[in-house]
């Protein structure tokens, strides 16, 4: 039976540099599944989740797919509504991930970039959990430099994510991004080599 690719589960809180690390893995030739991009595609024009979201949350979609602001307002502070939304979106993302894995089944290694990997059962399907991390002051500065981001919005996002210290404790490997790109790239390159070797 053919051996499946070694799976690196890549995760990290907002502003930790996960997107940069994912680009580094791509640069090194590892296919990367981007769960956030899969969510956007499923909720975009013609996306497979749009009709179900409109049925569950009337008025939150339009010609461009889901209106993310309206949907956020519909579920914010309502755990039951959030669970309903997740029950629609998660299966769509899982199908896209399964297609990605089939498409790259002959590769020695792949990366699954999943922001909430450790908040759900996703970590069980990977061979190694890599958590991207940086000092809190660096994280805060990065996030607040984004257009439209406020300290209040940052706090709301962080409230839905495991604390960085907890993620670090659950990680097989921590990828530090607070010391510059070169040290980060060296860690990523080392991990890519290990993954290709199936370790």
Model segments located where?
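P-loop (Walker A) phosphate-binding loop of NTP-binding proteins
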Residues: 13, 25
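Hydrophobic anchor at the beta1->P-loop junction of P-loop NTPases
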Residues: 10
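ATP-dependent NMP and nucleoside kinases share a basic, alpha-helical "lid"
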Residues: 97-104, 109-145
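Walker A/P-loop
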Residues: 19
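ATP-binding Walker
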Residues: 16
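Small-molecule kinase domains that catalyze NTP-dependent phosphoryl transfer to phosphate-bearing small molecules
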Residues: 96-99, 124-125, 145, 149-199
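ATP-dependent small-molecule kinase phosphotransfer cores
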Residues: 37-109
């Amino acid at each position: 039976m053919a051996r499946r690719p070694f799976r690196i589960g890549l995760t990290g809180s907002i502003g930790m540099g996960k997107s940069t690390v994912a680009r580094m893995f791509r640069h090194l030739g590892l296919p990367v599944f981007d769960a956030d991009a899969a969510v956007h595609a499923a909720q975009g024009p013609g996306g497979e989740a749009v009709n179900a979201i409109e049925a569950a949350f009337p008025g939150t979609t339009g010609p461009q797919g889901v209106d993310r602001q309206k949907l956020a307002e519909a579920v914010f502070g309502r755990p039951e509504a959030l669970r309903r939304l997740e029950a629609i979106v998660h299966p769509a993302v899982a199908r896209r991930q399964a297609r990605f894995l089939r498409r790259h089944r002959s590769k020695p290694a792949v990366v699954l970039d999943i922001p909430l990997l450790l908040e759900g059962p996703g970590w069980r399907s990977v061979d190694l959990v890599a958590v991207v991390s940086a000092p809190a002051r660096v994280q805060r500065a990065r996030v607040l430099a984004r257009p439209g981001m406020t300290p209040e919005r940052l706090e709301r996002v962080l409230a839905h994510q495991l604390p960085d210290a907890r993620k670090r404790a659950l990680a097989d490997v921590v990828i530090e991004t607070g010391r510059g790109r070169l040290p980060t790239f060296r860690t990523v390159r080392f991990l890519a080599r290990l993954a290709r070797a199936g370790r």
